[in-house]
UniProtKB/Swiss-Prot annotation:
Glycans are attached at N427, N517, N596. It is an enzyme of class 3 (hydrolase). GO terms for cellular component: endoplasmic reticulum; endoplasmic reticulum membrane. It comes from Drosophila melanogaster (Fruit fly). It comes from the Eukaryota. Its EC number is 3.1.-.-. This is GPI inositol-deacylase.
């Protein structure tokens, strides 16, 4: 038992250190921001647009964006000819965030020969915290519908009513998606682009209003739109460009859902976005998802705020919008095309860069610089560029085992450079050439290379090419004239030598494992397939160490593909010896149930610099895994903290120390524990029983490793200890400071506050009446704040009084128990000896009387450890109500009444707390074993039902307070009845 206790303590300490290190690495070791700033070329101007029936939303507004015009512009009085786009800001977002998008569109319209231009509108939501308080969302959704109707009325003079594009950032993307639940509005929506939006579930589920908003949107869209759900056989790495089910049904003319004609595009910021993690940015109702690190000509990670001003990303979005817009036949206005399949292909070209299926035939003459290559490895560069077109023919007839070819072109932008053809002899020169050739650019993939020379590569199966095109004899590489360095690389190889299968290392695997001891010179491509990578916190560090390079700078591009997560393709780049030669591989979402990762592994494609030789190894990345664990699961911390407090309270409620002992002074009694870890393991088994029995509600579907729960729970234990010690210091040292702060906030005089504290200390029921009335008159958070302040001051005064009595008692005991000075004088009288003997006899008699009397137990406010735990639970309840309190505070100035989702649980907490103080709880009584069982059950409920749905914790805390007050009340009532 002693060994087990020591191991448990070490486990708690180790988990705490892991959590702190993961938190540190998450915020410190972040890749640099490579976004370029978007600058306005004219003064940004916002013209307010009057919204019909918008008077009921006094704090909202609709604006039209324009630049440079000195005179005010009113879209309602002016003929608008552009294609309408609405920008919807998100959590605490400003309507002015549209500037980057709209300014890029204005510049692009000036250089557009077709005359296409866009009209950008933006909504002012008063920078409301819509991600923290769900009561905002229904109001914002209703106002967005009014804005759409108003904008449609501006363009109602057209022969055809235009369709609108919605661009939403953060929670604005969810609002844009939610308007589709109204078919009357949905039929006017052309495309919705969401930027870093938690689409299918919120980042933190903090109240019932937020959960209801997501559930209602999901339920309606399930009926009106075709959903895409990964199955056991899904593998997007084998078919990256498969069409979504909605488009397939439309193309086959099956009975398609009503809203399948709306194109939904979602984007995620990648590793730099610490507010909305990548796994939340996709939706099962989407047609296309892309990470900014994989978008062509963007190829970087954006944090949550830079996603709305990153120039490369803004250009990509506007490039798509201009591609789907067209000028009407009468050239009177601009509109967005309504052919969804065509728009989707354009979106794929912009955000994914798909393989182009159409193959065009190009004719070449015999004139030109023609060459034939038969080598397996070719590295051909022209440092000073080319004055004319250069042709290289690569024979298809190879040995049987050399069936794969990787061909890379450098500094060839968008021109066709790869073809297949049937070569013939030139009668004049005797050289081979191709009269006509078929483009293979649909097999070419563009690779990000930061600001260096563009890379594009094609991976070809020579056997399939020979079978498909029997008459072909050669591949043709055409390099256009260029003043820059240009060239290409060729690597023909046996695919068995370039594919390596590995398993995800276990977390206890400490060693670095070899992958390739040394690559051959000229190696261009290598594929690594990783099985058993199933959890989003798991991470592998792949070390690509250059052993010898011709040039001081090299280039390695890694492409990571997760087979069950469409649109989460990511690229990473290594480019110099100064950079750490490491890549990180992880997955954005949990693997689907019963998914076989051996048949469909995570794929890591390594595109190497052929002028280098490399040593490649891999290991379990503890630093990356811990940072991802914190990022993915920090939302579980409140539930585990409440679980710890319940287990601590279960122990404290039946533990009574004697008055005057040192233990009674320690409010952290019970927090140095590890027994709450038993609840974590027990809930894993209990969850399976609940699911199989189908009697109780189904627990939250959080099928993660138990290691995650242990680390988060140990972090909660540490947090509870820190909170308790902080409360102890505040009670002891800073009680007066908090008292003065409370006086300044409440603006009460010291005499008045002293009277109120005295009344509430001696008659705590008035404390409950005051706080409950405040909660019902304002909001629950204000009542809880008032209760917390008074409870803290009452506890601080009681602790100071008790500490003062304790010190005086100890001092008196020392004085009484101090032996009289033994005089060494020989002339000491017998009277002094008799007096000393009399004093000793009196002290012995008093000591015997004290031993015979039963020691007094610490009850009421003297049981400080119990009340400190109640104070912390009240503080947790206050924090859970903070978003709704902020919403109430902001809405007061506009006279808006918003729902208070936690009012009733807060009233229960306030009433129970006042009753406990009135009864001087806790009292020594019977029945604490039943209360302990109830607290165990509540702790299990927290871990089964409240880790993701954080708002349910308010009901659990209210239940704990109610059980405590009911137990104390029934015992006192039973005692009085039994006396009668």
């Amino acid at each position: 038992m002693f060994m087990f206790r020591n191991c448990a303590v070490l486990l708690v300490i180790g988990s705490i250190c892991c959590f702190i290190y993961g938190l540190f690495r998450l915020h410190v070791e972040v890749e640099p921001n490579a976004c370029r700033m978007t600058y306005m070329f004219g003064e940004p101007m916002f013209a307010k647009v009057g919204v019909r029936d918008g008077d009921q939303y006094p704090n909202y507004a609709l604006y039209y964006y324009y630049e440079g015009l000195r005179q005010p512009l009113d879209p309602l009085k002016r003929r608008m000819t552009g294609a309408p786009v609405i920008f919807v800001p998100g959590n605490a977002g400003s309507y002015k965030q549209v500037r980057s998008l709209a300014s890029v569109a204005l510049r692009k319209a000036m250089s557009n020969d077709a005359g296409i231009h866009l009209d950008y509108y933006t909504i002012d939501y008063d920078e409301e915290l819509s991600a923290l308080y769900g009561g905002y969302l229904h109001r914002q959704q209703s106002y967005l519908k009014l804005c759409i109707r108003t904008i449609l009325s501006i363009y109602e003079g057209r022969t055809e009513q235009p369709s609108i594009v919605l661009i939403g950032h953060s929670m604005g993307g969810k609002l844009a998606q939610s308007v589709l639940v109204d078919p009357a509005i949905g039929q006017h929506i052309n495309t919705i682009i969401s930027i870093s939006t938690p689409l299918d579930q919120p980042v933190l589920n903090l109240d019932t209003q937020l959960e209801e908003f997501y559930d209602q949107t999901d339920a309606v869209l399930s009926k009106l739109r075709t959903a895409t759900v990964p199955t056991m056989t899904t593998n997007v790495c084998d078919s990256l460009h498969q069409r979504p089910p909605s488009v397939q049904r439309m193309a086959s003319q099956d009975s398609s859902a009503r809203l399948d004609n709306v194109l939904l595009i979602s984007t995620g910021g990648g590793n730099r976005d610490l507010l909305v993690r990548p796994g939340l940015t996709s939706s099962r109702f989407n047609d296309l998802h892309a990470m900014t690190s994989a978008i062509p000509k963007v190829s970087l990670s954006c944090d949550h705020l830079s996603a709305v001003w990153c120039l490369q990303f803004m250009q990509a979005i506007n490039r798509f919008l201009f591609s789907v817009a067209y000028v009407r036949e009468d050239r009177s206005s601009i509109a967005f095309g309504t052919n969804k399949q065509r728009n989707l292909q354009t979106a794929l070209s912009t955000f994914v860069k798909p393989r182009r299926r159409q193959q065009n035939t190009v004719r070449f003459g015999a004139a030109g610089n023609w060459h034939e290559e038969r080598r397996l490895v070719i590295n051909k560069y022209f440092t000073n560029g080319l004055k004319g077109t250069f042709f290289d023919l690569i024979g298809l007839q190879r040995q049987e085992r050399y069936r794969k070819a990787a061909i890379e072109a450098l500094n060839v932008d968008d021109e066709d450079w790869l073809f297949g053809c049937s070569a013939e002899d030139n009668n004049k020169t005797g050289q081979l050439y191709c009269e006509k050739a078929t483009s293979l650019m649909h097999l070419v993939q563009w690779l990000p290379n930061e600001d260096r020379e563009p890379r594009s590569i094609a991976l070809l199966d020579l056997h399939n090419l020979r079978k498909t095109y029997v008459h072909w004899t050669h591949l043709l590489v055409r390099l256009p004239p260029s003043a820059k360095r240009i060239g290409y690389n060729l690597d023909i190889y046996d695919p068995k030598e370039r594919v390596t299968d590995i398993k995800m290392p276990r977390w206890y695997t400490m060693a670095k494992l070899p992958l390739i001891n040394e690559t051959l010179q000229g190696t261009l491509h290598h594929r690594v397939r990783i099985s058993e990578m199933v959890d989003p916190y798991q991470s592998i560090r792949v070390i690509v160490e250059p052993l010898q390079c011709i040039n001081p700078e090299y280039r390695v591009t890694a492409r990571i593909c997760v087979p069950w997560a469409a649109g989460f393709e990511r690229f990473q780049t290594l480019k110099s010896f100064d950079q750490k030669p490491q890549l990180y591989v992880n997955v954005p979402t949990l693997v689907p149930r019963h998914y076989n990762t051996t048949l469909n592994p995570v794929t890591l494609e390594l595109y190497l610099d052929p002028t280098c030789r490399y040593r490649i190894s891999y290991e379990y990345s503890y630093s990356s895994a811990l940072s991802r664990l914190v990022l993915e699961f920090y939302g579980w911390l409140p539930a585990h903290l409440v679980c710890v407090l319940l287990i601590v309270l279960r122990k404290q409620v039946e533990t009574f120390y004697d008055v005057g002992t040192f233990r009674s002074l320690r409010p952290y009694v019970g927090y140095l524990q590890y027994t709450s870890l038993y609840i974590v393991t027990a809930c894993r088994l209990l969850k399976k029983l609940i699911i199989s029995s189908r009697v109780f509600p189904e627990p939250e579907p959080l099928d993660y490793s138990i290691n995650v729960s242990i680390v988060i729970h140990c972090a909660a234990i540490a947090l509870s200890l820190l909170a308790t010690l902080g409360t102890w210091l505040a009670l002891t040292l800073y009680g007066n400071a908090f008292y003065r702060l409370a006086l300044r906030i409440t603006r009460l005089s010291q005499a008045t506050s002293n009277v109120m504290i005295s009344i509430m200390t001696h008659l705590p029921i008035t404390y409950g009446i005051l706080t409950i009335a405040t909660a019902m008159g304002t909001c629950s958070g204000v009542g809880l704040l008032l209760a917390f302040v008074f409870y803290f001051l009452m506890l601080s005064n009681a602790y100071k009084d008790y500490l003062e009595d304790f010190l005086w008692q100890k001092a008196a005991n020392l004085v009484r128990g101090k032996p009289s000075a033994v005089t060494e004088q020989e002339d000491a009288t017998e009277e002094q000896n008799e007096e000393q003997n009399a004093l000793k006899q009196n002290d012995e008699q008093k000591q015997q009387q004290q031993e015979e009397e039963e020691p007094e137990a610490c009850v009421g406010l003297q049981n400080f450890s119990f009340h400190v735990t109640l104070l912390l639970m009240l503080f947790v309840q206050l924090l859970l109500n903070a978003p709704s309190s902020l919403a109430w505070l902001r809405s007061r100035r506009h006279g808006i009444n918003l729902p208070d989702p936690s009012l009733y649980p807060s009233i229960v907490v306030l009433a129970s707390l006042s009753l406990l103080l009135q009864l001087r709880a806790p009292q020594k009584c019977q029945g604490y074993w039943m209360l302990s069982i109830a607290f165990y059950i509540l702790a299990g409920v927290v871990l089964l039902y409240c880790q993701a749905a954080i708002y349910r914790l308010t009901y659990v805390i209210a239940g704990a307070f109610a059980l405590l007050s009911a137990h104390q009340s029934l015992w006192i009532l039973w005692g009085r009845v039994s006396r009668v």
